[in-house]
Amino acid sequence: MTVLLETRNVSKSYGAFRALDDVSIGIAQGELVSVVGPNGAGKTTLVNLLTGLLKPTAGEVLFMGKSIAGIGPVELADHGLARAFQLIQIFPQLTVAETIAAAVVSRQKKRWRLLSRLTADKAIDARIREVAGVFGLRHRLDTVAAALSQGEKKLLDVASAFALDPKVILLDEPTSGVSTADKHGIMKTLIAAAERAGVQGIVLVEHDMDLVAAYSHRIVALSEGKVLADLPPGRFFADPGLIETVIGKRRAY
């Protein structure tokens, strides 16, 4: 099975504090790998290393078999590695169409123009409608982001990442701040969109263990900067002590 994204013996220190310690993980083609752990476990540092926002103190990160050393997040996105952030990264005054257009233009390396003109470009408009349709936002194209529900804002944020045509996408808490009733709907939409768009691998950072159990192929658990476990869901949730370490309490699954 082809490994798309991996870390090899990666460590990251901030001064005397070691946030990650000798972490080696891989995301293979066709996998959704969830990264879990208590606050301060190193999840955010790991995602920032995977996307080129941080450089490791030791070890290396590889994307499609090549080291990303010296490659920034924008160039990585051009090569097919996209990220949707935990905190919604959209401008409230822009419409849904304008938000997706900005992502499409950055991917196609077209010269920036007024967003209103971009949405009038037939090729760009077709791509906007395609992406919006996948995420159930086509009826909201002319709506400013500020007027969207929290769930719709999450979908728009992820839709913008999908507009980059990624091979691998990192989803950082994609359902945070969303009602429990909407969480599974959002996850199902994301996975269906990934399959439709030809996304080859997904990294999911998630606190909700119900979602992790339902959608993961593998679960990587971090604790104090180390890999505590790298297991399929069945084996992970069969270990009450492991679950207690990750979420701070025992729970039956």
Feature map (PLM): residue ranges:
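Glycine-rich phosphate-binding loops of nucleotide-dependent enzymes
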Residues: 2-253
